[in-house]
Amino acid sequence: MFHVKQPLINCQIIRTLLPAGSGVSRETGEKLALYESLLTRWTRTVNLVSRNDVEHIRDRHILDSLQLLPLLEPLPGPLIDIGSGGGLPGLVLAIATGRETHLVEADQRKAAFLREAARATESNVTVHACRIEQCNIAPAPVLTARALAPLNVLLGYALRLLSKNGVALFMKGKTAEQELTEAATEWHMRVQLSPSRTHPEASILRIDEISRV
């Protein structure tokens, strides 16, 4: 069904990131490999990932994004991914789960890539080519972002885009704990911090019960 030259994404590797008992089909591996091929090709002309990372897209970006699967698995309903860029993590999660996903990306060229990749991988995705502040999207139960903005800013987006009892999953770098300390002066929230399994200095923040101080 999907014709790609490079090896398929190893489904056994994906399974290590999933809750016990979850299955990953060969078709999912094929779709992720197709996405990887498209991301590599488009990056030659559109700045989707760092040029230094082109040879490491699978490990540094795709598998990194798949780390959210165990946190996402118990959360029902649509997902909104903001600042989607090259589809990390939003499109990767849409491919892996089949979940209804909304990708928000203001850059028109990146949005064009997202539409093409979503079409090619037959993903349940809607691309919103607009600034986060200006997008008219119904609130969703899950919000994701990866290396997008300071936590204070992300929480402001979450307050508007998350539905009642919604959960934010933010992928942060080595400043995660500092950002949490700073955000605590302006926000009430419940936080679960998990170390990244692909980047030693990175973290994943699971945040809910968000409100302003």
From Swiss-Prot:
Its EC number is 2.1.1.170. Its main location: cytoplasm. Disulfide bonds: none annotated. Coiled coil: none annotated. It is an enzyme of class 2 (transferase). GO terms for cellular component: cytosol. Keywords: Cytoplasm, Methyltransferase, rRNA processing, S-adenosyl-L-methionine, Transferase. S-adenosyl-L-methionine binds at residues 83, 88, 132-133, 146. It catalyses: guanosine(527) in 16S rRNA + S-adenosyl-L-methionine = N(7)-methylguanosine(527) in 16S rRNA + S-adenosyl-L-homocysteine. It is found in: Cytoplasm. GO terms for molecular function: rRNA (guanine-N7-)-methyltransferase activity. Pfam families: GidB (PF02527). Specifically methylates the N7 position of guanine in position 527 of 16S rRNA. Belongs to the methyltransferase superfamily. RNA methyltransferase RsmG family. This is Ribosomal RNA small subunit methyltransferase G. It comes from Granulibacter bethesdensis (strain ATCC BAA-1260 / CGDNIH1).
